């Protein structure tokens, strides 16, 4: 029941300030879901729960494939604080009542549902005031791009500067260089939103007011172009605030 779903989404909350729900209309079927998670959140293995349901008719193998793809593109690109635990679970249940569906359409709908829930978790991260998307392009491989993006996303220094709305790209460059990914400073380009602020690891002239407006928003987009290959990755994260410390300085 609709009311039962809302009650369940409410019941699984821990330090979440709001319940997290989604419904995606597919081609003749629906994928719906709920999740909880606000900290100790860097899947794999973190304190997050997500339950998805669909009325699509699909064999277990197809459901597993759709969920694996969806999780890889959503929850596994999320890092609130780089911390993990032993409690993460993502489940997908299918009733089959709507009949058979196109496999690609099912994967797309499951992925969209997972991504929405992951974005809701980032927005509700403990103490967070901003959602931050760290995009890395031009890496030697997707794996190295993920390594580099995750290093920036998990940096306490970078997170503090985002909270302070300070576009200090030097911290980003430092984390990229220490990440283990191949980084050639002479090729590195860093942008906030659509504004290039560093080229070849050297500051470039730009409209500071445009960057300031971007930093003041609720969503910050950062792109790090490494220029050494075709690999790319995006990590979804957030800023680090005093409220996060207040929440976690004791046992919760």
Specify the residue positions occupied by each region the protein language model found.
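Alpha/propeptide regions of enzymes that mature by internal proteolysis
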Residues: 1-252
């Amino acid at each position: 029941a609709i009311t039962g779903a809302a009650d369940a989404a409410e019941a699984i909350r821990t330090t979440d300030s709001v319940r997290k729900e989604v419904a995606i209309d597919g081609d003749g079927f629906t994928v719906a879901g709920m999740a909880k998670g606000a900290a100790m959140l860097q899947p794999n293995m973190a304190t997050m729960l997500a339950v998805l349901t669909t009325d699509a008719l699909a064999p277990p193998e197809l459901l597993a494939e759709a969920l694996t793809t969806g999780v890889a593109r959503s929850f596994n690109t999320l890092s609130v604080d780089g911390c993990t635990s032993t409690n993460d679970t993502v489940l997908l249940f299918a009733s089959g009542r709507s009949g058979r569906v196109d496999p690609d359409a099912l994967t797309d709908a499951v992925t969209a549902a997972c991504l929405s829930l992951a974005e809701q978790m980032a927005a509700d991260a403990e103490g967070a005031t901003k959602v931050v998307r760290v995009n890395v392009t031009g890496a030697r491989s997707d794996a190295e791009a993920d390594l580099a993006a995750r290093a920036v996303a998990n940096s306490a220094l970078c997170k503090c500067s985002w909270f302070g709305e300070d576009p200090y790209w030097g911290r980003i460059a430092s984390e990229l260089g220490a990440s283990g990914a191949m980084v050639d400073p002479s090729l590195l380009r860093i942008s906030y939103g659509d504004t290039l602020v560093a080229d070849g690891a050297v500051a470039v002239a730009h409209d500071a007011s445009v960057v300031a407006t971007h930093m003041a928003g609720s969503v910050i987009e950062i792109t790090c172009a490494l220029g050494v290959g075709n690999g790319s990755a995006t990590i979804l994260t957030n800023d680090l605030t005093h409220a996060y410390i207040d929440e976690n300085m004791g046992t919760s």
